[in-house]
Amino acid sequence: MIRVESIHKRFHDQEVLKGVSLNVEAGQVVCLIGPSGSGKSTLLRCINGLETHDEGAITVDGCAVHAKSKHIHELRMQVGMVFQRFNLFPHRTALENVCEGPLFVKKQARAQARENARHLLEKVGLGHKLDAYPSELSGGQQQRVAIARALAMEPKAILFDEPTSALDPELVGEVLNVMRQLAYDGMTMIVVTHEMSFAREVADRVCFLYDGTICEEGAAADLLERPQHPRTRDFLRRVLTSSDAPST
């Protein structure tokens, strides 16, 4: 489904990704963990075509991803993205935010777009907030609207860039519950997260990134409970509670 082969990405003199390779099969959930600045978000943006990689190759469902590709807009529609900061249109209701892409990018009929948006908002638990503006919604509700908006484009995969990092702690669970349901429904997902319990429960694989490389990857339980690389162990000690800390 998603193939990343030895990609490099530089910003001026700084190399942010240093030969990263990653394969994600259809229906899999892969969580990316690691310290800030390790290249996790940049990797997602390269997969989605929001950033151009300098070397290597990325394919989604057999189609090459590159900013210069004449098919880049079609490729971006196949890979949805949910950001840290919601990025909703403040002057549009929840329903209108979800309708935006289908109406203006996919050219759906308005009635169909609205019906689909209504269904998706109900799916994320916001059927009672169709006419609410972002300023009238909590952070967790706004992020659920953002997830519904991504789903409205009928993507083959969704990339999540720390979707709960901007939320108050009491709102994190409602967003993770929606993501769990997507995983159980078979959505292909790559998730940058610091929510280790979510990764342990939902992910098929976890990849630990450090300094632009994947230092270690493996089945979620194996990597989180029995990490092999010293940097992975050090990172997990810092982010996990003592009761969840991996053995040495």
Residue ranges and their predicted role:
Residues 1-220:
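ABC family nucleotide-binding domain
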